[in-house]
Amino acid sequence: IHKSKTLRQFLVRPKLLFLLVFFLTISCQPSKNMYMSGETNEFPSIEGNNLNKEKKVVPDDFVDKDLIIIVAFQQWHQGLVDQSINLLESNEMDLTHNIIEVPTIRKTNKLNEIYLDGVMRAGIRDDRIRNRTITAYLNKEEFKEDLDIPNEETIYWFLIEEGTSKILIQGEGIITEKELELIQSY
């Protein structure tokens, strides 16, 4: 019994050491800028995948209608995103506008991205929601600077003019009834 316990400990320690070294290695990969900076009042082109594993470029792939982009930075922002989208959809804005949510995550490495995408995909079964959720792995500081986003404490939303990357209006936090009226006026 003593020998088998020692053997188990001997076999488990190298596995733990390997996992520790592996995760330290992947977490230290250099960050790459995965978007192009836009001009003033322009939303930068950012690449990502929706939760159906389709590559998308925001806003370039959504030019047939005005586009509402809701940008989130923290996992707990999902409730704020959902409230905003519920307000938009209950007022049939999804018929006249493309509405997407863009969770932004600091660029790490492909293995981490695959894992995080899988976790998000597993939690969302609705194909419509999977299609409109485009995860962007990018340099968050540069992204925030380009869009004059001061911090990651809340969500930020942008109304983009049809066929362009021009920001018509933008706001922060849950979209309110008053902001909805402003969006509808464009």
PLM feature spans:
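Short, internal strand/loop/helix patches
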Residues: 100-102, 116-152
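N-terminal "domain-start" segment that seeds a small globular fold
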Residues: 31-59, 78-79
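Bacterial N-terminal signal peptides that target proteins for export
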Residues: 3-17
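C-terminal motif of bacterial Sec signal peptides marking the signal peptidase cleavage site
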Residues: 26-27
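Short active-site neighborhood of thiol/selenol oxidoreductases, capturing the structured segment around
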Residues: 61-81
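Soluble, non-transmembrane catalytic domains of enzymes that act on hydrophobic metabolites at membranes
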Residues: 57-61, 72, 172-177
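Thiol-/selenol-based redox modules, centered on thioredoxin-like
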Residues: 145, 153-186
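Structural microenvironment flanking redox-active thiols in thiol-disulfide oxidoreductases
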Residues: 77-126
